[in-house]
């Protein structure tokens, strides 16, 4: 890091692992949160099972494809910029999913979610590498990985609860809210 570069982490050290964990779990969480609503979304949008599968495939393709580039973008433009732009795009895409009136719109916005959701996962690992010596980085990475593994377990329960009580649109509004909160936290602390 160059001397004139501002510090990457401006908050308390204990909070870094929590923030990086939430950044890392955004991708898997947004995959599994809407899975319980597949049949409800299909009925509401008049979509076939294949079309519903495309909402997941579009997300995964965008997620995998952009994982190739998020690291290089973060090296070129800075960790903070890539995370903030990624979360902002994720938030807009989540709102787009909630407002989708047909399956084509939903597939498009799910692809945008995928393109942007991976930024947190890639950059969180780069931040750990930047801030910690190797032995300490392993400990922080193990904490982050635990939360990363928890996301797919709790996401369907959250999505199912939202579906039952508030309808399928609420799942994507919830993800929009998560995006807004995550953006604000990163804007303040990263």
Tell where the protein language model's regions lie, with residue ranges.
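Residue-level signature of mid-helix packing/kink "hotspots" within the transmembrane helices
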Residues: 32, 60-68, 152-153
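Cytoplasmic helix-loop-helix junction between adjacent transmembrane helices
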Residues: 109-148
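Small-residue-rich transmembrane alpha-helices and their cytosolic helix-loop interfaces
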Residues: 24, 56, 60, 141-149
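Interfacial helix-cap and linker-helix signal at transmembrane-aqueous boundaries
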Residues: 41-42, 73-74, 161-166
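Helix-loop-helix hairpin linking two adjacent transmembrane segments in secondary transporters
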Residues: 105, 142-188
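Conserved MFS/SLC helix-loop-helix module at the cytosolic interface between two early adjacent transmembrane helices
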Residues: 65-104
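Cytosolic juxtamembrane N-terminal segment immediately preceding the first transmembrane helix
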Residues: 1-27
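Extracellular/periplasmic helix-loop-helix junction of adjacent transmembrane segments
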Residues: 37-65
């Amino acid at each position: 890091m160059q001397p004139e570069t501002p510090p990457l982490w401006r908050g308390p050290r204990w909070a870094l692992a929590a923030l990086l964990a939430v950044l890392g779990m955004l991708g898997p969480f947004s995959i599994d949160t809407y899975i319980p609503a597949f049949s409800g979304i299909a009925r509401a949008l008049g979509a076939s099972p294949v079309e519903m599968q495309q909402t997941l495939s579009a997300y995964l393709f965008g997620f995998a494809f952009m994982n190739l580039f998020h690291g290089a973008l973060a090296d070129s433009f800075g960790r903070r910029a890539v995370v903030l732009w990624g979360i902002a795009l994720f938030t807009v895409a989540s709102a787009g999913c909630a407002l989708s009136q047909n399956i084509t719109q939903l597939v498009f916005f799910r692809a945008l979610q995928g393109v942007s959701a991976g930024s947190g996962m890639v950059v969180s690992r780069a931040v750990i590498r930047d801030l910690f010596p190797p032995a300490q980085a392993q400990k922080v990475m193990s904490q982050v990985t635990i939360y990363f593994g928890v996301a797919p377990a709790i996401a369907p329960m959250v999505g199912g609860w939202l579906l039952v009580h508030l309808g399928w649109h609420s799942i994507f509004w919830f993800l929009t809210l998560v995006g807004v909160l995550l953006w604000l936290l990163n804007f303040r602390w990263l």
